[in-house]
A protein has these predicted regions:
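Short beta-strand->loop
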Residues: 96-106, 123, 149-152, 236-255
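Alpha-to-beta junction loops
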Residues: 50, 69-78, 94, 156-158, ...
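Bacterial N-terminal signal peptides
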Residues: 7-16
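Early extracytoplasmic/lumenal segment of secretory-pathway proteins
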Residues: 22-88
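Ligand-binding pocket segment of bilobal, Venus flytrap-like solute-binding proteins
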Residues: 165, 169-172, 176-249
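Short loop->beta-strand "edge-of-pocket" segments that line small-molecule binding or catalytic clefts
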Residues: 149-168, 176-178
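Periplasmic solute-binding protein
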Residues: 86-94, 116-146, 174-175, 256-257
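A structural signal for short loop-to-beta-strand junctions that line the ligand-binding cleft
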Residues: 73-78, 96-133, 149
Length: 257
């Protein structure tokens, strides 16, 4: 029978299950590369004596590796970045649904997968990120970009910069909007966004921030930490970019982050 894996964006599973295993080793495949994670791994090993064998790669590389290894894969825990990638792994049948009161008590229902037929949950969320709107503080009024819906409003025609809609960051945003607005309204919203683009989608999130600051467009969409990196940068040119843009965490009066 094909082996499946547990997809966790939380190491709580390791605390609850792997710590009881006879082998004092956990094999972790991770697409996350942050200093906070390093501290978490080190603290876990200090507290339990369990060694973490880690394989680092991007999300696509990890999924491809799991498929190639098949039932021989040594992976115990998988960390992927973004719900869209977790969804893809779930659809590919790579995750083993588990029942864990510890995880279910610690992680809200909106940050974990829907239960499988046996009641097990394929994956749990470990952290969240905000998809924010940046805007030209001179040419755009904050109230015109207070919601995601306004990105598709005709009043913002010709103002929008955004990376490819095929990127998981945007797929997750589109999925969230569809969840709240429904398919018909979200389709109209997406068409409105296309009509509002100042240029064809290109670059990453940092490029959208820079494009707004440079006047190529007036509104951009980015994950919040890209802006935070530029704010903390030692480069004067990065800080100059940040000075030119405002930031909105959309839909604060309703379902936003």
């Amino acid at each position: 029978m094909k082996k499946q894996w547990v997809a966790l964006a939380a190491l709580a599973l390791v605390w609850g299950a792997a710590a009881q295993a006879q082998e004092q080793v956990v094999n972790l495949y991770s697409a996350r590369h942050y200093s906070t994670d390093e501290a978490l791994y080190n603290n876990f090993t200090k507290a339990t004596g369990i060694k973490i064998n880690r394989v680092d790669a991007d999300d696509a590389g990890i999924i491809a590796r799991l498929k190639a290894e098949g039932s021989a894969s040594p992976a115990d825990v998988i960390l992927l970045v973004d719900a869209a990638r977790l969804w893809r792994g779930e659809q590919d049948g790579l995750f083993l649904p588990i029942k864990s009161k510890l995880l279910e008590d610690a992680i809200p229902a909106n940050l974990r997968a829907a239960p499988a037929a046996d009641g097990g949950i394929p994956w749990f969320g470990f952290s969240t990120r905000a998809r924010v709107v940046v805007y030209d503080k001179v040419r755009v009024k904050r109230e015109d970009v207070d919601t995601y819906e306004e990105l598709g409003d005709p009043k913002n025609k010709g103002k929008l910069c955004i990376r490819s809609g095929a990127h998981p960051y945007n797929l997750s945003l589109f999925g969230a909007v569809t969840e709240h607005l429904g398919p018909e309204k979200s389709e109209a919203w997406l068409k409105g966004m296309v009509d509002n683009m100042a240029r064809a989608p290109k670059g990453g999130d940092t490029d959208q921030i820079k494009a707004v600051a440079a006047g190529e467009c007036q509104i951009g969409v980015t994950n919040s930490y890209y802006l935070a990196r530029m704010m903390r940068s030692d480069k004067p040119e990065d800080r100059a970019v940040v000075e030119k843009v405002g930031v909105v965490f959309p839909n604060q009066a309703s379902w936003g982050t």
